[in-house]
Structures are given as structure tokens and as C-alpha cells.
């Protein structure tokens, strides 16, 4: 599988909930190659291990990807310190992604918690043919 690596600028940052952050990153080459269900590896500044983070948005026209992650340790806390204009070291797209069924009349997408964001590109692909069922730990999420 072909993947790309580089330093890409953060265009948007949102705090979605306690310990839950969303970023939009400008990386046209990765966005052009990405498919629903794939992920990227992001290297937090000062760390040696990359963090795998699922894609929750792919905009091929704008050349952006969107990621959402939960703060779980020092690596994701370092990533969450990035602000608009900062660059992230991104490697991707990785993984095989979801199997797309272009002829499907109806699909049901089921996810829970931090497993919901990767379903967004899939729901966008199927549009009105998709029924989405999402579960969360609490109303805060």
C-alpha cells in the first residue's frame, strides 16, 4: 500500500467534549489517497511512537482530513496541545479501509464511543441509504 509522510498544517481545532478533540489538517496528498475506514499515524512532538488515529473526515476537493481522538496519555495530550497553524507529522493513509458496497440499497452502520468518528466518511458515502446507530458512554460524549 502506498502511503505519504510529511508535516501538515492544522486548519481547525475543536474541543468536542471533555478529553475529546477534533482537528482538520491540510494534507492534499493524503486526502486524495484516503478511503473510508483508513487511519493515519501522527507523531507527537517529543515522542518516538506515532499514535494511530482514524479518519473521520476526508475532503478530497479541499485537500483536508479530519481526525477525532480521546486524550488517553501523554502522547495524545501532546497532540491536543497543537493549535491552528501548527504542523503535525502525519503518515498515511494506512489500513485497508471499509469494503464499499456501491450497489447496496440499504446499509446499517453501528458504532460506539470513539468508534463513531470513522463511520462518518462511510455515512457520507452511502448518504440516504445508511441508517446509523451510535452508542455513547454518557450524554457528555
Regions found by a protein language model. Name each.
Residues 74-141:
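FNR/FR-type flavoprotein reductase catalytic core
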Residues 2-84, 137:
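Ferredoxin-reductase
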Amino acid at each position: 500500500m502506498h502511503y505519504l509522510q510529511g508535516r501538515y498544517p492544522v486548519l481547525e481545532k475543536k474541543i468536542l467534549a471533555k478529553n475529546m478533540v477534533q482537528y482538520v489538517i491540510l494534507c492534499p496528498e493524503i486526502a486524495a489517497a484516503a478511503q473510508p475506514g483508513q487511519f493515519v499515524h501522527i507523531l507527537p512532538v517529543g515522542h518516538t511512537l506515532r499514535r494511530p488515529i482514524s479518519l473521520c473526515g476526508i475532503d478530497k476537493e479541499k485537500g483536508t482530513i479530519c481526525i477525532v481522538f480521546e486524550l488517553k496519555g501523554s502522547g495524545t495530550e501532546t497532540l491536543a496541545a497543537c493549535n491552528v497553524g501548527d504542523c503535525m507529522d502525519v503518515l498515511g493513509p494506512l489500513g485497508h479501509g471499509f469494503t464499499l458496497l456501491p450497489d447496496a440499497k440499504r446499509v446499517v452502520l453501528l458504532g460506539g464511543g470513539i468508534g463513531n468518528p470513522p463511520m462518518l466518511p462511510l455515512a457520507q458515502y452511502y448518504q440516504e441509504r445508511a441508517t446509523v446507530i451510535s452508542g455513547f458512554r454518557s450524554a457528555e460524549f
